[in-house]
């Protein structure tokens, strides 16, 4: 069976045929590392990690590259506000990024290049664009001449005249056309900068990815992916830069994931409704957040709320219960083979359905439905006192196979959570017995474990401390 991918470039699903049989070159735009990542950043990390895992499951050798933007206006602003230098802030939040996405079940990319480590390549790329007549220098700044590239607008499906409407040249900008964009920005106000043929400065945002893709993956790649908000102008500008330089198609397939809304409102700083992964994973099982993200097709928007996350947790726990019950039944399993063929065929049918759904533009929402159908069949099998070791192992094996691709685990977490819950119950018992000394002692013990308690009318809640 073939994999079909919805290609933003053509606005249709296409059969996935990599440039080189059996191998996939994939690039995902990474974060600007000036703060902890929010759930809007987490969605592409989870989505494209799952795409990568499914491609590998399907037998492809995937070379997966995702960058860090470690110099940018936002980073410079954060450095000024905190009184620290840009590299220190970037290092801190790159480490925080790895911790957060690791908790969410994401593998590291094969390579995580940083902008600041590739400055020579970026400068050389810009020089070539100038030589070819696609860019021009203006008093230390360098701009890309958008009208020089005939295909501009093909990714976002807009004509250059449509884009021209509403475009403005800001005060102080030296570009010739309102649609032109910066490849190199002259240094100002003693901000971090690098030497270049045009004087001290730093690169524009769009050129960074073009240069790093070319350096680490080549002129043309199989899959370029990122959030829907990057389609224009970022990815459109990447195409203009890269195809002008090489004369070749930049990427064969373009994938974009949908937005996340918070309580039915668009997530934005002005609304103050950013939700940091750093905070969620202190209170929630990270697997539940990943499960939540994959419960909706990646191209569709997601509405996030704590109520929805709690509902997702309940559904996730039902799967965990079925999986745990299979393991318990395995302990008393037998070698009876009656009806094995029928039940093994049912398991294989679910495997085939999982593959079919994932082959259809990585439909994780329907793939998760397969898990619930598998759980339903497993529950029926056990409720009717079937005990075949072969069948039980087949159910367990397919649960593990699917969840390893989707990137979460149904294994019971026996460590911190259970210990904390047991201590809270002991403390509640002490309080009921008015043994406040023991109650305080248990609270102090939990505090030493970095666990913060909150006593409410509905009971005691806990979370991990800062």
Swiss-Prot record:
Q: How is the cofactor bound?
A: Binds 1 zinc ion per subunit.
According to its record, what are the GO cellular component terms? Answer: cytosol
One GO biological process this protein is involved in is: cysteinyl-tRNA aminoacylation
Q: Among its keywords, does the record have Zinc?
A: yes
User: Per its UniProt record, what InterPro entries does this chain match?
Assistant: Cys-tRNA-ligase (IPR015803), Cys-tRNA-synt_Ia_DALR (IPR015273), Cys-tRNA/MSH_ligase (IPR024909), CysS_C (IPR056411), Rossmann-like_a/b/a_fold (IPR014729), tRNA-synt_1_cat_dom (IPR032678), tRNAsynth_Ia_anticodon-bd (IPR009080)
Any idea which positions bind Zn(2+)?
29, 209, 234, 238
Please give the family membership noted in the entry: Belongs to the class-I aminoacyl-tRNA synthetase family.
Q: Which keywords, in A-to-Z order, does the entry hold?
A: Aminoacyl-tRNA synthetase, ATP-binding, Cytoplasm, Ligase, Metal-binding, Nucleotide-binding, Phosphoprotein, Protein biosynthesis, Zinc
Q: Which gene encodes it?
A: cysS
- Organism (species): Bacillus pumilus (strain SAFR-032)
Its subunit composition reads: Monomer.
What CDD domains does the annotation carry? CysRS_core
- Give the residue ranges of motif 'HIGH' region: 31-41
- List of residues that carry Phosphoserine: 270
Q: Which SMART domains does the record cross-reference, listed alphabetically? A: DALR_2
Per its UniProt entry, which superkingdom is the organism in?
Bacteria
Single GO MF descriptor: cysteine-tRNA ligase activity
Under what name is this protein listed? Answer: Cysteine--tRNA ligase
Q: What's its EC?
A: 6.1.1.16
Which PANTHER family does the record associate with it? Answer: CYSTEINE--TRNA LIGASE, CYTOPLASMIC, CYSTEINYL-TRNA SYNTHETASE
Task: List cofactor names only.
Answer: Zn(2+)
Catalyses which reaction(s) = tRNA(Cys) + L-cysteine + ATP = L-cysteinyl-tRNA(Cys) + AMP + diphosphate
Pfam families reported for this sequence: CysS_C (PF23493), DALR_2 (PF09190), tRNA-synt_1e (PF01406)
List residues binding ATP. 269
Where does it reside?
Answer: Cytoplasm
Q: Which cysteines are joined by disulfide bonds?
A: none
Q: What is its main location?
A: cytoplasm
Q: Where is this motif: 'KMSKS' region?
A: 266-270
